[in-house]
UniProtKB/Swiss-Prot annotation:
Annotated organism of origin: Rattus norvegicus (Rat)
Expression (tissue specificity): Expressed in prostate. Detected in other organs at low levels, these include the heart and various tissues of the urogenital tract. Not detected in mammary gland.
Protein name, UniProt field: Prostate androgen-regulated mucin-like protein 1 homolog
Membrane topology field: Single-pass type I membrane protein
Entry function: May regulate TLP1 expression and telomerase activity, thus enabling certain prostatic cells to resist apoptosis.
Phosphoserine PTM sites in chain numbering: S284
Key words of the record: Cell membrane, Endosome, Glycoprotein, Golgi apparatus, Membrane, Phosphoprotein, Signal, Transmembrane, Transmembrane helix
Cell compartment(s), UniProt: Cell membrane; Golgi apparatus membrane; Endosome membrane
Location of the region described as Disordered in the Swiss-Prot/TrEMBL record: 73-220
Record: glycosylation sites: N62, N96, N108, N168
Biased composition (Basic and acidic residues): 80-96, 206-217
Transmembrane segments: 245-265
Length: 296
């Protein structure tokens, strides 16, 4: 048990030395790792976005090797003095691989720590192989954050690395996750999908505001019915001028005077006192009460 722990510590120290050593040459494959607080983005140049994928059999073999190594190192090295916080502030790193061979990718020589979640493989993005090499044996580097721990496995030379290529030359790098290792909280594919979210909100059609007439037609009809007499009176007042109003007033007064004058004339014509008496009765008492009587 102690021997296994010592061997594991030696392998871990050798990996740290190789990782800390500067790369001797710069190759055309340049991966720029840009980390933000909630998510991470990996971009690659346009000329290396399409490469042939490696066979599935080698990936299966390497995955089994990584499972065994991860299981042994998880039980022996839960906490190591060299830790990297997963939730560290945003940082930017440029990583250059050491070989142009398209057979695999080495994270020990270039210093890449990739730990994508399994949901990256279920998104159905096109996969391409990024060329990188390494002669180091598979080594697991544990990085424990304040709340969760993530494992960045170093892949063997024959392990494929899949990348999701987009139109703006940004790709999401996916790596094989061992079974016994915890998953990293940040997912490059989630950042890729969230980068398109504002555009969907921007292009979303704005709902048309409805006018009060469209929303409440019944209310508008009731208001028009209640205000109909007022509108008619306003129209009549606007149609009649001051001269027309004066003419109507004079006509009404003339008709009233004519009616009362005709009634008075007819009253006088048909007196209630009756006719005057005959000559032999003219001086009688019956003619004194008659105003038409003249006794002079």
């Amino acid at each position: 048990m102690v021997c296994k722990a010592l061997i594991t510590l030696c392998i871990f120290a050798a990996g740290l030395r190789v990782q800390g050593s500067p790369t001797p040459t710069l190759l055309p494959v340049s991966l720029t790792t840009k980390s933000t607080a909630p998510m991470a983005t990996w971009t690659t140049s346009a000329q290396h976005t399409a490469m042939a994928t490696t066979p599935v059999a080698s990936a299966t073999h390497n995955a089994s090797v990584l499972r065994t190594t991860a299981a042994s190192l998880t039980s022996q090295l839960p906490t190591h003095p060299r830790e990297e916080a997963v939730t560290s502030p945003p940082l930017k790193r440029e990583v250059n691989s050491t070989d142009s061979s398209p057979t695999g990718f080495s994270s020990n020589s270039s210093g890449i720590h990739l730990a994508p979640t399994p949901e990256e493989h279920s998104l159905g993005s096109p996969e391409t192989s990024v060329p990188a090499t390494g002669s180091q044996s598979p080594t697991l580097l544990f990085s424990q954050g304040p709340t969760s721990a993530s494992t960045s496995p170093a892949t063997s030379p024959s392990e494929p690395l899949s990348a999701s290529v987009t139109s703006n030359h940004s790709s999401t790098v996916n790596n094989i996750q061992p079974t016994g290792a915890p998953m990293a909280p940040a997912s490059p594919t989630e950042e890729h999908s969230s980068s398109h979210t504002p555009t969907s909100h921007v292009t979303e059609p704005v709902p048309k505001e409805k006018s009060p007439q469209d929303t409440e037609p019944g209310k508008v009809i009731c208001e028009s019915e209640t205000t109909t007499p007022f509108l008619i009176m306003q129209e009549v007042e606007n149609a009649l001028s001051s001269g027309s109003i004066a003419a109507i007033t004079v006509t009404v007064i003339a008709v009233v005077l004519l009616v009362f004058g005709a009634a008075a004339y007819l009253k006088i014509r048909h007196s209630s006192y009756g006719r005057l008496l005959d000559d032999h009765d003219y001086g009688s008492w019956g003619n004194y009460n008659n105003p038409l009587y003249d006794d002079s």
